[in-house]
Amino acid sequence: MRLDSISIANFRNHTLLEFEPGHSITNIYGRNGSGKTSILEAIHYCALTRGFSGNNDREYLKFGEELFTIRSSFTSGQGIATKVSITYSPKREKRILVNEQELQTFSSHIGTIPCVTFTPREMVIINGAPAERRRFIDTAICQYDRKYLSDLLLYRRILQQRNALLSSEQDPRVIDSALDVLTDQLVAIATEIVLVRKRFIEHFTSMLGGVYQWIPEGAEPSILYQSSLGHHENLYEKDKIQQVFRERFETLKQQELQRRQTLAGPHRDDLQFYLNKREIRKYASQGQQRAFLVAMKMTLQGYLYEASGEIPITLLDDLFSELDEVVSGTMVETLATKGQVIITSTEKKKGKGISFFSVDDYKSSKEP
């Protein structure tokens, strides 16, 4: 996948900006606060229908303005053109058109433009709350597996209904009967989600080991998927997983009624990251944690290509600020051999064949 052009108006601190990246590496450079990251966020909007920081569209609207627009053009590896147009105003909410057809559901667009990002704020994947790690794995899988996306949305709806029932003041007999129905529905979808996640992590970890060879010290990376199945985590048979879930919910029933929330399921699962069998969050330096996340993003690029047949666009925000120059340079060179890479930095980076865009004066150039 390749971004051919993008124009943004009243987006973050940009009144109007037009950007045409190169086919390989493009370095967006400029002073801090000049809006480099905003360009990447606009591209991310076109790929995943939201910015880096989530679904609060209002925060991307330039102060004092009533509407922001993003217009972009992409070309797939098969030469298929895709045009994405996004408008947002607090009065009319967000509208997304793909090839001039308005999306009825934003989720239907996920996977059309595969995209891998690295931003400093994503360090929360390593050292933040479990929800951040679940978001990483869900966003990755949803870009190539539409059934998983559908299952995830259905699971969230059933979970919301089940939590509402647990919090209701209805007759206990009514709650008990309805709870059995919702639990059966939740177990069926939860099993599908857990199986896909486990298979993803298993293959992803094997690929991560190969990518990690370019990082110094020859460390051995691994990822552990922690599910609410407890000591049954190694199960891969659907019927057995369903049985364990049913037993788990039966055991937790009184606690759930008391706490008024669902206490088991994929929404409570987590990932643990290791280097040489030592948990990264506890024992690794900040530099090692950052390098591990970068390696994960490199792995994800290859994984999405393998799963979908389309090379993702790679967006790297402020990659060089805290990462070893050799490691970051190797990463960029490796990614560039596989697709389009767009990087932000405060200073212009040297490199053969790199395209440049100065966000301070909106000028483009290219190294010979």
From Swiss-Prot:
Entry keyword set: ATP-binding, Cytoplasm, DNA damage, DNA repair, DNA replication, DNA-binding, Nucleotide-binding, SOS response
A single GO molecular function term of this UniProt record: ATP hydrolysis activity
HAMAP family assigned to the protein according to its UniProt record, in alphabetical order: RecF (MF_00365)
Keyword DNA damage: yes
Subcellular location: Cytoplasm
Domain of life assignment: Bacteria
Free-text function comment from the UniProt entry: The RecF protein is involved in DNA metabolism; it is required for DNA replication and normal SOS inducibility. RecF binds preferentially to single-stranded, linear DNA. It also seems to bind ATP.
Family: Belongs to the RecF family.
One Gene Ontology cellular component annotation held by this UniProt entry: cytoplasm
Name of the protein described by the UniProt record: DNA replication and repair protein RecF
Chain sites annotated for binding ATP: G30, R31, N32, G33, S34, G35, K36, T37
Organism: Chlorobaculum tepidum (strain ATCC 49652 / DSM 12025 / NBRC 103806 / TLS) (Chlorobium tepidum)
Keyword DNA damage: yes
GO biological process annotation, one example: DNA replication
